[in-house]
Design a protein with these regions (language model features):
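Long, well-ordered, tryptophan-enriched scaffold segments
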Residues: 1-18
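Glycine-rich phosphate/pyrophosphate-binding beta-alpha loops
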Residues: 14-22, 112-116, 126-139, 193-201
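M16/insulysin-pitrilysin zinc metalloprotease superfamily fold
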Residues: 22-38, 180, 184-190, 197-222
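Internal maturation/activation junctions in enzymes
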Residues: 34-131, 143-144, 151, 263
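Cofactor-centric catalytic regions
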Residues: 91, 95-98, 102, 110, ...
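Extended C-terminal subregions enriched in glycine
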Residues: 121, 169, 204, 213-267
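Active-site rim segments in enzyme catalytic domains, especially the processed small/beta chain
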Residues: 123-186, 190, 200-201, 214, ...
Length: 299
């Protein structure tokens, strides 16, 4: 299937289409494009607030619309339009959290591995694979030595939901490798991904913003503390990683965000990313997430 994309500040960001959740990151980036993140301090309360709110709005849509397009019509063009993003952006209160946002109406009618490879010519491979939830189903086909995946866990049992369980149907899928090119000449800007279930689109948005809006190199972008919205809803609890400035955490709480500060081994909830950035002269720069045992190297 062809990837889906949006333009973000001169870059073209590619994600996997539904039934994958890549559209979540693209919806959030469209919303965030209306805010001048580059002039905001790296961890200012204002910046963290709008990023969290954009992810909430994106998940509100994704949790409803992402399903198997062979079974349900998904308004892809409308969901990814700048006009729709503008309308959704108006729902963000700069002073208060929206804990339980509703999906929009765009039509007017846990055991994952990721790798990225880029060659000297700028050809790139962004690859991700997962059985889901550790060992998937835990069922090993006799004589084959691997476990079967359990992606059916992400079906809805609501008979009125587009992602409702049905024979021969693909469920909402979390794994989404990403690719970014420059709009001006279609040259490669970055090949990257962030493992971690429903953290993946959230990681994509935060890492890309750190690269483009923050001007950071891949390793520095991956090293930054992150936030993670609760996987079970578009709103609810927001996990905040240790290292986020105390003043920012306190300000977000005052805005109404229900925060949970996370440290130590529990930081696995924030995902594990890999990035290869290619500058305009063709020089490659890689980074690997310190939250896992990955590695950035050259051959």
């Amino acid at each position: 299937e062809s990837p889906i994309s949006v333009d973000y500040r001169g870059l073209r960001v590619y994600e996997c289409p539904p039934n994958g959740q890549g559209i979540t990151a693209l919806i959030a980036l469209n919303i965030l494009e209306g805010f001048d993140l580059a002039v905001m301090d790296l961890f200012s309360p204002e910046k963290m607030h709008v990023m969290i709110e954009a992810m909430r709005l994106a998940f509100a849509d994704a949790k409803w619309y992402v399903s198997d397009p062979a079974f349900s019509k998904i308004p892809m063009q409308e969901l990814l339009s700048k006009e729709y993003a503008s309308e959704r952006r108006k729902l963000i209160d700069p002073k208060r959290a929206t804990v339980d946002p509703r999906r929009g109406s765009p039509v007017n009618s846990s055991g994952t591995v990721y790798l990225s490879v880029v060659d000297g010519m700028g050809n790139a491979c962004s690859f991700i694979n997962s059985n889901y939830m550790g060992f998937g189903t835990g069922i090993v086909p006799k004589g084959w030595g691997f476990t079967l995946q359990n992606r059916g866990h992400n079906f809805s049992l609501d008979p009125n939901h587009p992602n409702v369980l049905a024979p021969g149907k693909r469920p909402y899928h979390t794994i989404i490798p990403a690719m970014v090119t420059r709009v001006s000449d279609n040259s490669l800007y970055a090949s990257y991904g962030v493992m971690g279930g429903f953290m993946q689109p959230q990681g994509h948005v935060q890492v890309l913003s750190a690269l483009k809006d923050g001007g950071l190199d891949p390793q520095s972008a991956l090293d930054l503390p992150r936030f993670c919205l609760d996987a079970e809803s578009a709103g609810g609890r927001v996990d905040i990683e240790e290292g986020m400035p105390t003043a920012t955490v306190n300000a977000l709480r005052e805005m109404g965000h229900p925060l949970n500060e996370v440290s130590g081994y529990e930081r696995a909830v924030f995902g594990r990313g890999q990035v290869i950035l290619r500058d305009e002269s063709g020089v490659l720069c890689g980074g690997s997430d310190p939250r896992a045992d990955g590695y950035a190297g050259s051959l």
